[in-house]
Structures are given as structure tokens and as C-alpha cells.
Amino acid sequence: MDLSGLKSADRLENIIRNNPQVKLVVAGHLHRPIQTSFASTMVSVCPSTGNQLKLDLNPKNGSAVDEPPGFQLHIWKNDRFVTHTGVVWEGKELDMSQYVAYVNEKISKNEGIRKD
């Protein structure tokens, strides 16, 4: 994956640097969720909706791994953005309603939250 690279990366870098309004570059997919910076801008790469590649930092290696398909949800609001990376997997739902009520109560009283 890393050996593939981006052809004419210098051209893209020049475009981004000359357009400071570009705050996020979104791409996909590379079979792994990846975030990096490029030309002083955030880059977010979506995982595959099919198989994923095993996380291996040696670019000469590479193998598929049994991880669920993934997706990204990007939310822009004014000049800010948030990216959520999720997986397509039907996990067991956990009831956190009591904890959420506890946190909300502490927030309403302007109190800290114990982490023990």
C-alpha cells in the first residue's frame, strides 16, 4: 500500500498550499483507516467496504485480515469538521444510560467526573 504512492504528489501539494481554504482532504479507500497531514492539511483515508489489510508498518509486507468493512462519516459545521470512522458490524449493545445520567448530573452541577 505504501509502495504504491501518489503520482504527482508535488502537484497536489502545490494546489493545497496555494488554496488555504482546503482544511481536509478525504480519500478512499486503502483497505485501512489512515489519518495523516499533507501540505499542512489533514488527510483522512476511508477503510474498505470489503476486506481490510493487516496493519503492518513494513510497506513490503501486506496481507488481508478478517476485520469488518468500514466507513467514514464527515461532519462539517462552519469552519470545523469531525470525522467518525466506523465498522459494519452488529455488536452487542451496552446500556450506558446510568453512566450518561451520572455524567450529565455532574456537568449540570459543574463538578468533575471521577475516573476510577
Residue ranges of model-derived segments:
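Active-site environment of divalent metal-dependent phosphoester hydrolases
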Residues: 22-37
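A broad, low-specificity signal for short, low-complexity segments enriched in glycine/proline
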Residues: 2-7, 33-37, 43-46
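Broad hydrophobic/π-residue packing in well-ordered secondary structure
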Residues: 12, 26-27, 71
